[in-house]
Amino acid sequence: MSIKVGINGFGRIGRILLSNALEKPELSVVAVNDPFIEPTYAAYMLKYDSSHGLFKGDIEVDGQNLVVNGKPIRFYSERDPANIKWSETGAEYIVESTGVFTTIDKAKAHLNGGAKKVIISAPSADAPMFVMGVNHKDYDGTPTVLSNASCTTNGLAPLVKIVNDNFGIVEGLMTTVHSYTATQKTVDGPSGKDWRGGRGAAQNIIPSSTGAAKAVGKVIPAMNGKITGMSFRVPSANVSVIDLTVRLEKAASYEEITSAIKKAADGELKGIMAYTSDEVVSTDMLGNNNSSIFDIKAGISLNPNFVKLVSWYDNEWGYSRRVLDLLEHVAKVDASKK
């Protein structure tokens, strides 16, 4: 089964999606669209990455094509998704990774060019959200536009699922200590409604809002209204960490909670949830394929019903991996419906 993929937006996530797709034999990226760069510049940015290093493969440019490991990838430069001729390359599954077209109405414009399904690599206000290992099996082939939620929701939801399934969560608060992203400022500048967000990203720890915790309630309905959270944007280029503090229904020692997480990570959530007892720091998680890596030694329990859990995630690499996993899952479900 060969799944032909198109990528709209060749920013951080778009480029890392392409790099990851090359490791998946069932996926073939046949087209990329980005109106702000030329193919030669796209090739340069794909080859050299300040966080993930030199691209492991061959990259060339042939007219309007990128040629990656000998395979041509058509490069478009359309501002309006409705004008991208995905059908020219046979691209049926489109990853919408611009961060702009995140509603059903905006993202479905890709269907005009021949796309079959659109997966938004960001949270969406109205598209159904799916998180691998949590609710991906709920996909029934019906939606034409769906969301892979956020990197933080992907890091948080598997952890919440394990804890709630085993011990029950009464309520919880999450803080993500999050690396800065492209939307932030390198030096102080205007930032509309979010004044703190306009301060220099490399100089400050910046409190910020996040909908990631509330979004868990959309993929785990039992958690709706029970978890919320916030973010601290910190002077780090990549890798983030979740601090989840929960009150449990069923009393449990920290060791029992750890045992439940390890069991799930070695079983049903293998490749999505992982764990470590090493004395790790953020850079040790660069390029980690998992959605969430539970740090056994970093958590702490106040009493058997109140515990803090810590879990790392590569907010670029691990998240991009899940987008592609979801795409593969969607394509297989779609094929089974024919």
Swiss-Prot record:
* Involved pathway(s): Carbohydrate degradation; glycolysis; pyruvate from D-glyceraldehyde 3-phosphate: step 1/5
Report whether Ribonucleoprotein shows up as a keyword of the record.
no
Report the domain of life of the source organism.
Eukaryota
Substrates-to-products reaction catalysed: D-glyceraldehyde 3-phosphate + phosphate + NAD(+) = (2R)-3-phospho-glyceroyl phosphate + NADH + H(+)
Could you name the active-site residues? 151 (nucleophile)
The record's subunit annotation is:
Homotetramer.
**Name this polypeptide is given:** Glyceraldehyde-3-phosphate dehydrogenase
The organism's lineage? Eukaryota, Fungi, Dikarya, Ascomycota, Pezizomycotina
